[in-house]
């Protein structure tokens, strides 16, 4: 699973210059600079396979693509809708790794071939322009379902997933939907990282971003592997 989070770092000029700090609607600055951390985590063990840090304003997608250096054939990579992109699908596909990711609500897929389990086959393109120009797409399978709240029927959440596992007979939609919700294990890993291991005013101690901060953050993720076990 790939996901990201933001961590507070000490309020030094160097940290603020390298990593930045969020603003607010009122124009005030955050009390501390922040670093963005993107991690590749194994669902069952919470093992952190790989991690990258970047400035707060840099999007997770850029770093997530670099984390694909650590995926291998036979893995099933899961991601949330914020990481959905043609580039992510293409890069994962090129690594020989299967994927299962959530689709943003504003992204549409045509039902090209209806499958018996309710899912359907479609195609993903880099952009609408390239689609019109006949750019070769990647075939995907789309799974749609709704999760209902047992006590609040009106509180429904609609999910749409995209996957490289095209065979409904081998990989039924219900099985993949249940599998996807293991993605929340990455939230538990982040909780362990931030709350249990980094329970201090700022998550990273170092005042120097390029040396101490990187080393401190990497040591923390390695420690989390031991803690998670």
Predicted segments, located by residue:
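Single, function-defining residue in the core of a domain
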Residues: 2-229
């Amino acid at each position: 699973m790939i996901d990201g989070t933001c961590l507070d770092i000490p309020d030094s000029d160097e940290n603020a210059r390298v990593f930045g700090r969020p603003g607010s609607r009122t124009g005030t600055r955050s009390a501390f600079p922040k670093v963005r951390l993107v991690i590749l985590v194994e669902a069952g063990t919470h093992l952190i396979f790989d991690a990258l840090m970047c400035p707060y304003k840099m999007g997770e997608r850029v770093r997530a693509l670099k984390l694909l250096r650590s995926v291998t054939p036979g893995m099933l990579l899961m991601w949330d809708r914020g990481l959905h992109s043609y580039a992510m699908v293409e890069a994962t596909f090129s690594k020989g790794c299967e994927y299962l990711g959530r689709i943003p609500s504003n992204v549409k897929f045509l039902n090209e071939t209806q499958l018996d389990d309710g899912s359907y086959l479609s195609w993903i393109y880099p952009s609408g322009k390239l689609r019109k120009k006949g750019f070769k797409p990647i075939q995907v399978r789309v799974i749609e379902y709704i999760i209902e709240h047992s006590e609040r029927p009106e509180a429904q959440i609609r999910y749409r997933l995209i996957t490289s596992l095209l065979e409904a007979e081998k990989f039924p939609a219900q099985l993949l939907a249940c599998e996807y919700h293991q993605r929340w294990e990455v939230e538990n890993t982040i909780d362990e990282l931030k709350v249990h291991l980094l329970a201090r005013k700022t998550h990273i101690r170092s005042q120097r971003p390029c040396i101490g901060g990187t080393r401190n953050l990497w040591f923390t993720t390695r420690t989390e592997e031991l803690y998670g076990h």
